[in-house]
Amino acid sequence: MDNIFSASWIKAARQRKDVVIDFKKVFEAKPFPVKAELQISALGVYCCEINGKRVTDSVLNPGWTDYNKRIQYQTFDVTSLIEKENTISVGVGIGWRFHKWYDLSSKIISYGNVALIAAIKLTYENGEEINIYTDDSWTSAESTVRYNNMYNGETIDFNFRPGKFIPVKVIPYTKDTLIPQEGEFITEREVIRGKELIKTPEGDTVIDFGQEITGYLAFYFKGNKGDKVTIRHFEKLTKDGNVYTENLRSAKQTLSVISDGKTHFIKPVYTFYGFRYIAVDGMDISSPDEFVAIVVHSDMKRTGYFNCSDEMINQLFHNIVWGQKGNFLDVPTDCPQRDERLGWTGDAQVFCKVASYNFNVEKFFKKWMGDLRAMQKNSGTIPSFVPTKYDDDGGSSAWADVATILPWQMYLTYGNKELLRENYILMKKWVDFMRSWALKKKPDEGISTDPYLYEGHWHFGDWLALDLPNKEAVEGATDKDIIGCAFFAYSTSLLIKASEVLGIDCKYYKNLYKNIKKSFIKKYIDTDGKMVCNTQTACVLALHFGLYNEKEPLAKQLTELVKSFGHLTTGFVGTPYLLHVLSDIGENDLAYELLLRKEFPSWCYPITQGATTMWERWNGYKPDGTFATPDMNSFNHYAYGAVGDWMYEKMCGIRQKEGTAGFTDIVFEPIVAKAMDFAEASIETKEGIVASRWEKSGEEVLFTFTVPENTAAIAVIKGKKYVLNTGVNEIKA
């Protein structure tokens, strides 16, 4: 058992709500240990120093979990920091433990208070071990960070004097929930200098960083004693060039600093912000580069790249990547700025494929799937966002289906059977829940009693689709029961595939899948072979999930719908699959037409409005310069970035052979665009870099495919198959 389990949870004897607490312990170490190891965690987020030096470059530890079920602890080698006389200092802020959606108050530790647990083990050459634990010998005091909140920011008062450190209280908080670090650490990844200094018509001093980011500022501040600088972080300017913060809802996103007359380097520690712009009050600024924005996200290795001859599509890919950077902080969140920032399951499942191409997210999602398992109800349902404090029964199709889609996609990308096995029960329990729901429906509920249809449950629907007259509506026109039944079939099919990979008998589920399809066709496909619900998303789901073998009528229906509107109308549910389906039915020109479209609604429309990340809504900022409803209008929301996997798989043609995983057997089949000169993409797999490029050369196209060691590959060009060799392969056609 790790050393931390011998330590005690401690809290300050006195603590004002929302103030950062500094914990301290002075100890001696006889010269000199050959190894010193620190294990540490907190109810809140911590920043730890030994003898004035940070023990890690990671931030916002211990990360975000459901603290009632799982709390990560970290282990650091601190050998180089140990001296004869030592002081360990740990600042702890409230972090993710207490906020609007996640208040874990209890009698042991009330709202706005924090706690710490830590253990240091000193090991000497002769084998002797000395341990220092958190206990009642530690002391604490309030810090100069007088306020901290994940949504609202920090207030730092350098005039505050903490006074005497006083003994802490040991609290009987459980250690049963402590687990070793599972996910990637959150770290500072990039630094962006201010690009433009703006004086708004309303008189605000604004700095534009030119890129929407998630992170915080760093700058030097000196004022007269008592001077206060207040900095607001936000995403957009109005059409008149003024500060726009309404879409943050109740989140303040503010940093306030009160001067003691000395120069200080300012960098928040216990919070993060989502922003492109800052508005500075109380400080004279002569140049925008007096401020830098520090980008933070989980420490994932970049693995996927894309480039083409169309700069707007390059910007789209840039926005997809930055949407991922801005929302992958230990948990895949929907947005990083407003009073939400939650691990919405639907957003994660639609984006997980392209996420796994852009970055190595195996460890990141392994941790979050642990969160999913911890929060899955006994019934099998998954809450709508994870972690959560709410007794949310979940069960919305396309959201709770993260239980099957995410584990399967991680297996496909990385080929890790053990990770799939670890989450098999997660998958099975969700499918079993839908089956049990279908079985228990009653005639008086006004819905079908067909035992193979997942109907009558609540669902979010095709979220933010544009196929209702009211473009501010959120649920879309697609029948929610169609979505429910389609995903019931799809999740069952994925469970069957997982069972076959793991050697688990799945005859029951194969029979179940056959009957779900039969019932789906009977109720939702008309006598002409078309969907009874005449929406793009309904057709897309039936085609992409293979729910009806006679595809031609459905393909015609979808094509006519897209052409009649002249644009996509899909929301969160249909959009990820739309271009894939159009390509699969031979409508490649139509797929490219949608991708390249610059007018609203489209993927490129936000780029014409200066977007540097993906938007939550197709109409977040309208052509007339007005905003969509501020109740739900994030400008950093990655879900629609799911189109990126079509860019990898169809435009550049990198896909895996059916029935394989881990990119061990590849089929290159790129779709050349009439309106583009070249396109290229690469994905770093466990065996090496897989790359594809096509470039027009007169009447011909030069295809270049790169195949790593231990990888089989073919190319399919104009219907002809080519067996490829390891290394670089060129084909002209």
Features from the language model and the residues they span:
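Extracellular/oxidizing-compartment recognition motifs
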Residues: M1-R338, G346-D347, K363-K366, P383-T388, ...
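Alpha-helix capping and helix-loop boundary segments enriched in small/acidic/polar residues
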Residues: R14-D18, E37, G63-Y67, D77, ...
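Alpha-helical support elements that line or immediately flank enzyme active sites
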Residues: E37-I40, Y216-E235, Y270, G346-M375, ...
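Active-site acid/base region of carbohydrate-active enzymes
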Residues: V45, A141-E142, P288-N319, K325-G326, ...
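C-terminal capping/lid segments that line or modulate ligand- or cofactor-binding pockets
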Residues: I88, E154-D157, D339-E340, N358, ...
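Non-catalytic C-terminal accessory modules of carbohydrate-active enzymes
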Residues: I108, G112-A119, E128-F160, I179-F185, ...
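Heptad-repeat amphipathic alpha-helical coiled-coil interaction surface used
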Residues: Y411, A489, L495-I496, Y513
